[in-house]
Amino acid sequence: VIKIEVKASRAVDFDSSEPLYVKALAFDSNKRFDMNFQQVKPACCDVFVWVGVWRDVIKYWVLSAREVQNNRYYSAGQHRGNVGEGQLHVKNSNITEFMCYQSTPRDLILNIRAAYQRQYTQ
């Protein structure tokens, strides 16, 4: 049994104060974006499936829990006094570092199994 935590986030204009539905960006936008994957709990799962949503594109990333916990962008302790839970921001400035985890919908099962293997063999 593979324990999976699925998180989704929208790519939104980082520099806008408009409501989320207004500042949602298209994939080919040149504006700075921020996707905040919140309440991430690496100790509670084996694999993460992250869904990044733009107005016109959906991207999937599959990471082992260890890959998330050890990622330099992972921030443990999202809220004061919180234990075992954090957040990770995927932005225009770091998205290329997550390309190796990207998956097509068709390959999600294969990539989930591969991430599970990485979780327990590396």
Task: Pin down the residues of each PLM region.
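Nucleic-acid endonuclease domains
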Residues: I2-K3, A8-Q122
